Amino acid sequence: MTLSAEQLATFDAEGYTVLPRCFSDAEVTLLRHEAETVLKHNRPEVWREKSGAPRTAFAIHRFSDAFSLLARHPRLIEPVRQLFVEDVYVHQFKLNAKAAFEGDVWQWHQDFGAWQRDDGMPQPRAVNIAVFLDEVMPINGPLLLIPKSHRARNIDGTTAYPLWTLDKETVTRLVLDAEGEDGIGVVAPTGKPGTVLLFHGNLVHAAPPNITPYPRKVVYLTLNTVANRITKSTRAEWLAHQDFTPIVPVADDALAEYARTRRVAAA
């Protein structure tokens, strides 16, 4: 799968693009089931909310066959190769649960801030890919993006939170700069399960809490170019992978076929 000229232009201008329903119902059902399984694991890679509800599970492609296939799926790999015209590797793989009633806030930040300061990533030549496992709606803690903020490059952040977060004045300025004819400088991409969102590593984003009965599980795959590999990671390997082997995509039907074999085995 490749991006259209319009999608490429949108990504360049706005810092993100949305690809509706990239994965089938059968593929999403498999991934949602696998997500429930991995979120029950008691291991360092699985972070929890204060309540004990799952918050984020990292490196799940290392202990789930289904997510291993997703990490190498051509519908995710090829668009990023197209953007950079280079081989890519997995820098980070995670599942954000945003559990119903429990999913807490993620403050305003740029991901490249952490990649550069904590991992020694030279340039923002990495892309985040979000795969919606549940329907993402305006009400259940969707990701909030500030369009065009990737053009601000690397903005100084603070360490007042487990991310390099941005202060209110900076966020306000970026939002005002991004305001369009509607007078709104923040967007919340929504979509059905199986939708994919690509966004630039310097795009400023956040997420409000989820206080609804509707969960909002999203898989995030960060792909970095091999030539831009990290040089001095201070974080655990499951937070910033140090296997820089170029990804070899699986067959396009690999995930669907795995879902089919699982259904047959369970019958």
Regions found by a protein language model. Name each.
Residues 1-14, 19-121, 234, 239-254:
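Non-heme Fe(II)-dependent double-stranded beta-helix
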Residues 41-45, 52, 193-198, 202-267:
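Non-heme Fe(II)/2-oxoglutarate
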Residues 92, 124-130, 140, 186, ...:
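Extracellular structured ligand-interaction cores
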Residues 98-100, 146-153, 222-228:
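Short edge-strand/loop segments of extracellular domains
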Residues 104-108, 117-119, 139-145, 154-158, ...:
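A short secondary-structure junction signal
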Residues 109-113, 169-183, 215, 234-239:
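Short, surface-exposed loop/helix-turn segments at secondary-structure junctions
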Residues 118-138, 190-191, 222-225:
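Short, conserved beta-strand element in jelly-roll/cupin
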Residues 139-204:
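Double-stranded beta-helix
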